[in-house]
A protein has these predicted regions:
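Transmembrane alpha-helices and adjacent helix-loop boundaries
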Residues: 1-215
């Protein structure tokens, strides 16, 4: 939303943030956060200062790296969704006396969600798989646990397959949720009123049905 601001300071800051985090590899960001103590041994000032190594644990480093990187991508997804809504509707809402916040909540966002949800689902699935990178800092994710078992039991291939199955389960659950969210926000539109491909195929395979719908 800051990218759409008329304030040049806000729009510039948001542009720089998105440019920086989208333009550098996630693994590099992860390693920089994990080794932050090399640049800043302590954080804070005076009696409020804390040792960076005590604060930036592997889990915290992974959380910061993945969250900030994903936020940069999602910022562009949300911006695209808002821009997809006809500007005339915003002007009409303002003409009816709605404030900027009311227009965003009641007019813009409900329509923008139809554009936002599909790429958000894709980003969620990508993020689930990207968590495997935290193996390099030992943050205790799924791949870290399976790799530890593989090293102990000498079952590298087997544990990689187990991890792959779990990733498939997680991404399938995310895809299922995305599908139902898309259907919910597509109600009342041409996309929401269309029957699914499977239902149309089943309808065409009913006994006695011929071309044109005439027996």
């Amino acid at each position: 939303v800051m990218r759409l601001s008329d304030n040049p300071v806000l729009s510039t800051v948001s542009w720089f943030y998105i440019w920086l985090f989208r333009g550098t590899p996630v693994l590099v960001q992860l390693l920089l956060w994990f080794n932050l103590a090399l640049f800043f041994p302590t954080l804070g000032a005076g009696p409020l200062s804390v040792d960076t190594n005590d604060l930036i644990k592997p889990f915290v480093a992974a959380l910061l790296a993945l969250a900030l990187n994903e936020a940069a991508y999602m910022a562009e997804v949300v911006r695209a969704g808002i821009l997809a809504v006809d500007e005339g509707q915003t002007e009409a809402a303002h003409a009816l006396g709605m404030s900027q916040g009311q227009t965003m909540r009641r007019i813009v966002l409900p329509q923008a969600m139809r554009v936002i949800i599909p790429p958000t689902g894709n980003e969620t699935i990508t993020m689930l798989k990207t968590t495997s990178l935290v193996l390099v800092v030992g943050a205790g994710d799924l791949l870290t646990r399976t790799s530890a078992i593989a090293a102990r039991e000498f079952t590298t291939i087997e544990m990689l397959l187990v991890a792959s199955v779990w990733y498939l389960v997680l991404t399938s659950v995310a895809s299922y949720g995305q599908y139902h969210l898309e259907r919910r926000f597509a109600r009342g539109t041409s996309a929401g009123s269309q029957a699914s491909v499977g239902r149309r195929i089943l309808a065409n395979l009913r006994p006695g049905r011929v071309e044109g719908g005439v027996r």
